[in-house]
UniProtKB/Swiss-Prot annotation:
Sensitive to extremes of pH. It comes from Rhizobium leguminosarum bv. trifolii. One of its GO terms (biological process) is defense response to bacterium. Thermostable. This is Trifolitoxin. Keywords: Antibiotic, Antimicrobial, Bacteriocin, Thioether bond.
Length: 42
């Protein structure tokens, strides 16, 4: 059970990083309100 939780946390961390990276890239090319808000939440 603990192993599963740890794996879930790792996956979540990875997806947050990916989302944040995408949001940063998006805001660099053009200001996207949705992307910026998502980036702040992450």
């Amino acid at each position: 059970m603990d192993n599963k939780v740890a794996k879930n946390v790792e996956v979540k961390k990875g997806s947050i990083k990916a989302t944040f990276k995408a949001a940063v890239l998006k805001s660099k090319t053009k200001v996207d309100i949705g992307g910026s808000r998502q980036g702040c939440v992450a």
